[in-house]
């Protein structure tokens, strides 16, 4: 099926979503499964960059949600001391052997979790972390320990997601567009970027920076206040601004533009990606 045909089938299925069950067969099941497979392989993305803008394939996001209706809950094995889990989404690595790992070309440290329909590109390093459905993690990126990449999130090339970083998903609460971290960004430990916000190329977020759609992003040099997007090449730290009643409220502060000193402190280590 072409992508245009898949889109039409998914949109029709979405309108009739209450009728979809694990017993559903035919074009509806085939379209949902084909879309999830394309997302899993990286040939389709929930969002793709066109020039300077990001285009969201809303139908692909709908397919991720519809996938939940196609399977019943089941026991999933592999836990410590023969423990199990209870879920309806397969691991991306289910049934993988040496050949599949070599073909995929990324490293997955024990106890990392990647759910089916997420794409992991070559050269990625996954420490014990979590990558949810429909996400896209591009080449050379490090997803460090306890970092989470939310549903349908888009992570660019050569990004470093430090320990405990949270990149928000789109499924609950429902978001119009995915959270996006563009190429060559460094996201400091325990930072959170959520609600479909965009961190533009080459930016650095310091430790403990939290950005949602309502977070004020303040340029210290110009005083400009923006929302939802960090400009390319920004260095951002946590800060505060005066509010009513003499109370200061949290904000994110652009303290400078990325320079050689910043790059030397946040460069990726190629030795880890061999």
UniProtKB/Swiss-Prot annotation:
Keywords from the named record: Acyltransferase, Amino-acid biosynthesis, Cytoplasm, Diaminopimelate biosynthesis, Lysine biosynthesis, Repeat, Transferase
EC number per UniProt: 2.3.1.117
Species name: Cereibacter sphaeroides (strain ATCC 17023 / DSM 158 / JCM 6121 / CCUG 31486 / LMG 2827 / NBRC 12203 / NCIMB 8253 / ATH 2.4.1.)
Binding site for substrate: 107, 144
Similarity annotation: Belongs to the transferase hexapeptide repeat family.
Quaternary structure note: Homotrimer.
Enzyme class: transferase
Cell division is among the record's keywords: no
Name of the protein: 2,3,4,5-tetrahydropyridine-2,6-dicarboxylate N-succinyltransferase
GO-annotated molecular function: 2,3,4,5-tetrahydropyridine-2,6-dicarboxylate N-succinyltransferase activity; nucleotidyltransferase activity
Superkingdom of the source species: Bacteria
InterPro entries: DapD_Trfase_Hexpep_rpt_fam, Hexapep, Hexapep_transf_CS, THP_succinylTrfase_dom1, THP_succinylTrfase_N_sf, Trimer_LpxA-like_sf
């Amino acid at each position: 099926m072409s992508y245009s045909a898949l889109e039409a089938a998914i949109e029709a299925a979405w309108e009739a979503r209450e009728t979809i069950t694990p017993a559903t067969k035919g074009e509806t099941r085939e379209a949902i499964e084909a879309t999830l497979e394309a997302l899993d392989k990286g040939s389709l993305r929930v969002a793709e960059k066109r020039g300077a803008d990001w285009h969201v394939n809303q139908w692909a996001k709908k397919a991720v949600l519809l996938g939940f209706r196609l399977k019943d809950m089941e026991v999933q094995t592999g836990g410590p001391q023969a423990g199990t889990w209870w879920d309806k989404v397969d691991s991306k690595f289910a049934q993988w052997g040496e050949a599949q790992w070599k073909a995929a070309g990324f490293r997955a440290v024990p106890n990392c979790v990647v759910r089916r329909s997420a794409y992991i590109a070559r050269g990625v390093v996954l420490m014990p972390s979590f990558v949810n459905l429909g996400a896209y993690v591009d080449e050379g990126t490090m997803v460090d320990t306890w970092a989470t990449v939310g549903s349908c999130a888009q992570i660019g090339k050569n990004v470093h997601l430090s320990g405990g970083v949270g990149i928000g998903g789109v499924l609950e609460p429902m978001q119009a567009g995915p959270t996006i971290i563009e190429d060559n960004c460094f996201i400091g430990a325990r930072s959170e970027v959520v609600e479909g916000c965009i961190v533009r190329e080459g930016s650095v977020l310091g430790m403990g920076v939290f950005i949602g759609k309502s977070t004020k992003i303040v340029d210290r040099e110009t005083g400009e206040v923006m929302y939802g997007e960090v400009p390319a090449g920004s260095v951002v730290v946590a800060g505060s601004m005066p509010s009513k009643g003499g109370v200061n409220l949290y904000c994110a502060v652009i303290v400078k533009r990325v320079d050689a000193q910043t790059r030397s402190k946040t460069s990726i280590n190629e030795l880890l990606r061999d």
